[in-house]
C-alpha cells in the first residue's frame, strides 16, 4: 500500500461530493464543509496517531509521573500540548470524533454494548455536519477521514494490538462482532486484549461493508514494522491502538502485568523509536500521542475547550456531567517541531482531525469545520523549515 503524493486540485475540489456518494436506498447527505482557510502547515506527508486510554493531564504529566518516558523524555524531543482536551465520555465517542467529526450520541457514550446500526432521526447532516440520532455503526453516507484520504489519492491503515489473537473472539483483520450482536470484546480475555470500542474504523458501514477494503486497512499491530521498512509501504495516515493493558485502560491486566501509565510507558518505549527511525517519519512524518479521555473524575474530568458543541437533541452533554472529556494533553513529534516546545493553545480531538485534513488538503468533517476551531499552528510546528 504505497504512500501517495498530494492529489491534484480538481480532485480536491470534487472531494466534498465524491466522499458522500450514497448507495441506492440511502439518503445522500450534504458534502462536508470545505476548508475555509488553509493554515500554513509544514510539508508533512506521513501522519501517525497513537491513542492511549483514560488519564488526566495532571496525573500523566505531573511530578512525579508514573510514566517518565511519556511525561519527560518525549516532550523533550518534541512538543507538549498542555491544553489538549478530549471531547466526551466514554471511549468510543472520542475515537469516532477523531476520524469523522461526529459528536458523541448516547450509544457511543455508553461504548455500544450492542453493535447496532445508527438510527437517524433526520434525513441528512445538519449545517454543522452532524447526523442526528443514536447508534453505533454509521450509514455509508456519513463521510469519514479514510473516505476522504482514498478519494484524494492518499493511503491509510489502522493497527490494532492483539486483534485476532483469539480467532473465536474476532477476526485478525477488520475485527468486529456481527452487526446487531452483543459486543464481546470490551473486556480483555486471556491471550487477546483487543477492544473494538477502541477501533473507530469498524463503526462505519462504508468500511466494514467492503470486506476486502476493511481487511486490507484494519490490521494487527504486528504488521507495522513491515510497513515502516520503506516510504512506499508506509501509509500516509496510520492510526495505532494498543491493547487494553498497553493503552493504560486496565489497571490490573489479565496477563499479570501492571497496567495504567507504567504499561503505557512500556509500550511507547518499544514502538515510538521504531516509528521515529522509519524512512517515512524521518522524511516528512508527524506522530501525535494522546488519550481518548480523562479519568472522568469531577468537573475537571468532563471539562472542554474550543467552544465544543454537543450533538443537537442529545439526552446528555458529551461528558455526561460536563461539556467534554477533560484535559488530557498531547505529545507531538516531528522534525518540524522544535524539541522542548510547550504549547498552551487550547485544542481537542476535533482540532486534531482538522489538522490532519488540512495537512492533506481535505475538507473539514463535522465539528472539525467549526469556525472557532483551529489547526495546530506555529505554536506546535516551531522548527525552522527549509526555504528551498
Predicted stretch roles:
Residues 1-9:
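Bacterial N-terminal signal peptides that target proteins for export
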Residues 8-18:
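Bacterial N-terminal signal peptides
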Residues 25-388:
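N-terminal pro-sequences and low-complexity stem/linker regions of secreted or lumenal proteins
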Amino acid at each position: 500500500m504505497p504512500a501517495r503524493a498530494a492529489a491534484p486540485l480538481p480532485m480536491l475540489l470534487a472531494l466534498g461530493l465524491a466522499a458522500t456518494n450514497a448507495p441506492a436506498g440511502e439518503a445522500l447527505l450534504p458534502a462536508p464543509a470545505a476548508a475555509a482557510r488553509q493554515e500554513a502547515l509544514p510539508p508533512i506527508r506521513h501522519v501517525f496517531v497513537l491513542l492511549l486510554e483514560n488519564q488526566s493531564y495532571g496525573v500523566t504529566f505531573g511530578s512525579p509521573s508514573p510514566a517518565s518516558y511519556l511525561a519527560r523524555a518525549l516532550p523533550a524531543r518534541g512538543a507538549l500540548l498542555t491544553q489538549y482536551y478530549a471531547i466526551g465520555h466514554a471511549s468510543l465517542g472520542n475515537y469516532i470524533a477523531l476520524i469523522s467529526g461526529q459528536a458523541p450520541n448516547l450509544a457511543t457514550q455508553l461504548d455500544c454494548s450492542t453493535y447496532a446500526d445508527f438510527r437517524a432521526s433526520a434525513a441528512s447532516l445538519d449545517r454543522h455536519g452532524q447526523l442526528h440520532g443514536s447508534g453505533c455503526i454509521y450509514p455509508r453516507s456519513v463521510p469519514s477521514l479514510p473516505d476522504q484520504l482514498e478519494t484524494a489519492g492518499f493511503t491509510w491503515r489502522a493497527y490494532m494490538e492483539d486483534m485476532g489473537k483469539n480467532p473465536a473472539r474476532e477476526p485478525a483483520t477488520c475485527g468486529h462482532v456481527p452487526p446487531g450482536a452483543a459486543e464481546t470484546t470490551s473486556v480483555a480475555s486471556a491471550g487477546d486484549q483487543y477492544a473494538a470500542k477502541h477501533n473507530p474504523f469498524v463503526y462505519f458501514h462504508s468500511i466494514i461493508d467492503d470486506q476486502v477494503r476493511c481487511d486490507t486497512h484494519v490490521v494487527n499491530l504486528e504488521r507495522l514494522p513491515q510497513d515502516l521498512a520503506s516510504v512506499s509501504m508506509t501509509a500516509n495516515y496510520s492510526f495505532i491502538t494498543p491493547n487494553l493493558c498497553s493503552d493504560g485502560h486496565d489497571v490490573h491486566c489479565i496477563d499479570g502485568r501492571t497496567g495504567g501509565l507504567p504499561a503505557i510507558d512500556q509500550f511507547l518505549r518499544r514502538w515510538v523509536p521504531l516509528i521515529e527511525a522509519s524512512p517515512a517519519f524521518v522524511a516528512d512524518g508527524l506522530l501525535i500521542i494522546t488519550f481518548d479521555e480523562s479519568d472522568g473524575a469531577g468537573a475537571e474530568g468532563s471539562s472542554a475547550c474550543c467552544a465544543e458543541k454537543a450533538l443537537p437533541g442529545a439526552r446528555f452533554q458529551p461528558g455526561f456531567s460536563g461539556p467534554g472529556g477533560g484535559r488530557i494533553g498531547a505529545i507531538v513529534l516531528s522534525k518540524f517541531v522544535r524539541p522542548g516546545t510547550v504549547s498552551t493553545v487550547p485544542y481537542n480531538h476535533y482540532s486534531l482531525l482538522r489538522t490532519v485534513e488540512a495537512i492533506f488538503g481535505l475538507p473539514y468533517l463535522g465539528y472539525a469545520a467549526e469556525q472557532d476551531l483551529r489547526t495546530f499552528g506555529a505554536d506546535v510546528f516551531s522548527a525552522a523549515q527549509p526555504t528551498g
